[in-house]
Amino acid sequence: MLNRVAASCALILINSPVYAFDFSFKGMIKSEVVTSSQGVASFGGAYSQVAPTHALRTDIFGGAPATEQQTNFLESESTSFQAAQSRFSLNMNHEKIRSVLEFDFIDGEDGFTNQTALQAQEPRLRRATLYYDMDENWTFFGGQKWSTAAGIKSSGSYNWIGNAYRAGKSGFLAVEVGATYKNDGLMVTGALTGKGRNATAGGINANELGRMPGLALDVNYSFSGHKIGAAGHFAELNFEDEAGFTAGENQDATLMKVYTTLNFGAVSINAEYYTGDALNNQNALGVAPSSGLNGAGEVRESFGESGFFTYLTWKVNTDSTIKVGYASASVDSSDRNRLSLTDLNENTTAYINYGHKLMDGLTGFVQFTHFNTEYGGDFEDFSTVVGRAGVVFKF
C-alpha cells in the first residue's frame, strides 16, 4: 500500500508543471591568507586587504600629512585571513528561458574596509539576469550582468574582486537590457544601460548616470580557438538638473576598447586596451577619479584615461596551471594638473600565480602581486607587494 502511494506521489510530482524548470546551484568557497609588505588599498583610500587594487601613500593619512606614527602604520606589514571573495549562484533553465542569480560576500557598502569576518561578509548581489533564447541566432536579455563593454571578464588573478581594476582592467557589472546575435564565429551585442540618481551614495557610486539610456556595444569574432573583439559604452552624465547644481555642464562618459584571446595549445594569451572618460561613473573601475559636483555645486569635469592588461596562462599538466599578468593605467596628460595628492595618476600591477588541483573541485593556489602607484599633485609613487595563498572549492 505504501509503495503504491509513494509511486502515485512520484508520478504527480513528475507531471507537475513546476518540475519542467531545471535548477542548478553553483558556487565557490575561497579561503586564504593575505599579506602585504606595506599599505595597500581596496578601491578606496584605507589600508585594506579585502580586494587589493593599489599601493597607498605613506605620507598622507585621512587626507592630511601623516604623523610619524601614522606613517609607521602605513609602512607596516600586515597579514589577514580572508573568505570574503566566496560566491554562489542559482541558475534556472526552462525551454527558451535562462536565468542566473549570483551573490558574493564582501564589504562593498563600507568601501571594502572591514576585514573582520563577522562584520564584513555580507551578501552582495552580483548578477540577476534573465535570458530568452529566441532561436540559435538571437538572445534577448535584461537585468544586472557583466557589462556588455566589459570585454575580457577575468584578469587571470586569484584576487577575483580586485581583478586588476584601477590598473588596466576596466568594465564591471551593469544593469542592461539588450540582445545578442550569433552567426558562426561572429557575436554582436547591443544594450541600453542606465542608473538612476543617487545623491547620497559614496565611493564608486557617488555620481551615477543621470540621463538614460546609455548605449553599450560589443562585436567579437572567434576562429580556430582565438577571439578578437571591440567594445564600448557611451553615455552622458546629467549634472545640470541635479538639486545642488550651480555651474558647469553635463559630461560625457565613454569607454572604448579592443581585446583578444589567443590559444596555442597549453599556452593562451589574453590582452585588452581601453581609453575613455569618466570610467568610475560607469562602474568601469578606472584609475581616474569620477566626475561630480563639488561642495559649491560646480561640476568637476571628467578625466580622460587609458590602460591595458595582459596575462599568459600555461597549462603545465592536467593538474597544474601558471599565470603571469601585467596591467597599467594612467590619467591623460592633459588632465593630470587637476589631480589632488590622493587621486591616482598611474597604477601598475604585475602578478604571478600557481594553481594545483588537490582533488575534484578543490584547488590550492599561491600568488604574488606587485603594485606601483603614482599619485597626483606631487606625482610621487609608492609600491607594495601582496602575497596570498589558499584553497578554492568549486561546487
Regions found by a protein language model. Give the residues of each.
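C-terminal closing repeat unit and adjoining cap/tail of repeat-based domains
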Residues: N353-T369
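Membrane-spanning beta-strands of outer-membrane beta-barrel proteins
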Residues: F81-A83, P123, F172, M212-G214, ...
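Sequence/structural signature of outer-membrane beta-barrel proteins
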Residues: V34-S36, I106-T113, K145-I152, G156, ...
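Outer membrane beta-barrel
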Residues: F21-G45, Q49-A51, A55-R197, L209-M212, ...
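Outer-membrane beta-barrel "beta-signal"
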Residues: H356-G361, D381-F395
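Outer-membrane beta-barrel proteins
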Residues: F73-S78, T116-L118, N163-A167, N205-N207, ...
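Gram-negative bacterial Sec-dependent N-terminal signal peptides
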Residues: M1-A20
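Detector for outer-membrane/organellar transmembrane beta-barrel domains
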Residues: L217, Y221-T348
